[in-house]
Amino acid sequence: MTPHASPDSTTWFEDNRKNWDDRAAVHQASGYGIPELIDDPEAIPSTLAPDVDRLGDLRGAAVIHLQCHLGTDTVGLSRLGASRVVGVDLSGASIAHAREIAESCAADIEYVEANVYDARSAVEGSFALVYTSLGVLCWLPDIDAWARVVASLLSPGGRFFIRDDHPMFMTVGEDVSNGLRIEQPYFQRDTPLTWEDEDSYVTTPGAPK
């Protein structure tokens, strides 16, 4: 299933894939909570911890994590007792790191390199839980098409869980010295927003940017 967007959307996805390929090594080098996951077989990532009580009992459930990046939260989902855990991400470099992390954590996780819009054709089976969180919505050119993918992955009675920033958060300009100002669009548009940044959202002294 492809998103309903401009013909240039393929180029946008490729730019985003390259961006996340570049970020993958930086994020792994930053720590990203990975050493704690490896050292403690019961550790749950701090990014997943707020969701644990809301997710309920996952023992024996099939779970898919969309836009999983390095898969640290995917490891956490496997530690909550899911019988099958799948992580999907656009970035091949992120998936490669995710597989290494899962192996170091002795976590049985299937990782699939695929555009989230192609997740239904890339992954077999259905899932009791489709999970995604933190910084996922802002990368999607077509929310309706994405929602249809999510629905297609759910087994009867399955649940979809998302935790992300409110869209209003992305409308506020970066310079807040004179208060909050709305500078970016709230609603979906046909063209992407672009930024040129020298670093990522983690601090990694000495790491490549």
Model-based region annotation:
Residues 122, 138-139:
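A short His-aromatic
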Residues 32-62, 76:
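Conserved alpha-helix/loop element of class I SAM-dependent methyltransferases that forms part
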Residues 132-137, 163:
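Residues lining the SAM
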Residues 159-198:
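Conserved class I S-adenosyl-L-methionine
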Residues 121-130:
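A short acidic, Gly/Pro-enriched loop at the edge of an enzyme's catalytic core
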Residues 144-159:
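A short glycine-rich, Lys/Arg-flanked "PGG" loop and its adjoining helix->strand segment in the class I
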Residues 61-119:
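Class I SAM-dependent methyltransferase SAM/SAH-binding core
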Residues 1-37:
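N-terminal, positively charged/glycine-rich alpha-helical extensions of SAM-dependent methyltransferases
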